[in-house]
Regions:
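Short beta-strand/turn micro-motifs composed of small residues
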Residues: 50, 108, 170
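An N-terminal, well-structured beta->alpha segment
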Residues: 1-77
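N-terminal small/polar loop signature for handling phosphorylated ligands or for N-terminal nucleophile
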Residues: 55-128
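Conserved beta-strand elements of the Class I
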Residues: 47-48, 103-105, 151
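A glycine/threonine-rich phosphate-anchoring loop and its flanking beta-alpha core
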Residues: 125-187
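Hydrophobic residues at beta-strand termini and immediately following loops
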Residues: 25-26, 77-80, 153, 180
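Short loop/turn motifs at secondary-structure junctions
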Residues: 42-44, 73, 100, 146, ...
């Protein structure tokens, strides 16, 4: 009879792919495949988005090195706080446009992923960040191509931010958090 510990040990050592509905690539060493994922989704110059607390951690440096080794140019944006704010999202959009990026790789916990998703929703939409506020009608966009190709790499467990298109962002004028969403702003993996 297998024990729960043995089942967990086996699961943690396997590479597994599934969808929820976002495709998920799970397993030890899967970060090594980032170059292949970028090639698959035609990302040649991603903006790496993380938070201030994670910018110096080994997994962020490893991600950047793996991209460089795969001949993929990238830039790091680490201006996301533990409670992402609208001004940080605007700064991320400026960095994305200025760097002529063609995709986003979000790495970190729920806040970093939410900040990156908000950047992805708004960077090419031609509208305001708050057009995507959950309680409002879904914005009509001229093209769904306005959403950059998006890869998430969660470094914590719990929020599930890597599997959904919503983002919790603080409105610095109102001093309140709002949920941003667009049904077609999907994470690619």
């Amino acid at each position: 009879m297998l024990s729960v510990a043995k089942i967990n040990e086996n699961f943690l050592n396997e590479s597994v792919d599934w969808e929820f509905p976002i495709p998920i690539a799970y397993g030890l060493g899967r970060l090594n495949e980032i170059g292949s994922f970028c090639n698959k989704f035609k990302i040649s110059n991603p903006l790496i988005v993380t938070d201030e607390g994670s910018k110096e951690l080994p997994f962020v440096n490893r991600l950047a090195a793996l991209l460089t080794n795969s001949s993929i140019k990238s830039q790091l944006f680490y201006g996301i706080s533990p409670n992402p704010r609208d001004d940080e999202i605007n700064a991320g959009c400026i960095a994305y446009r200025k760097g002529d990026h063609d995709g986003i790789i979000a790495i970190g916990g729920g806040s970093a992923l939410d900040g990156a998703k908000a950047i992805g929703m708004t960077v090419n939409s031609g509208g305001s960040l708050w057009d995507f506020e959950y309680r409002k009608p879904t914005p009509v966009l001229s093209s769904l191509d306005c959403f950059p190709t998006f890869i998430t790499i969660p470094t914590t467990a719990g929020t599930g931010a890597e599997t959904e298109s919503t983002a919790m962002i603080t409105d610095t004028v109102k001093g309140m958090k709002f949920c941003l969403a667009h049904l077609l702003s999907l994470i690619h993996i």
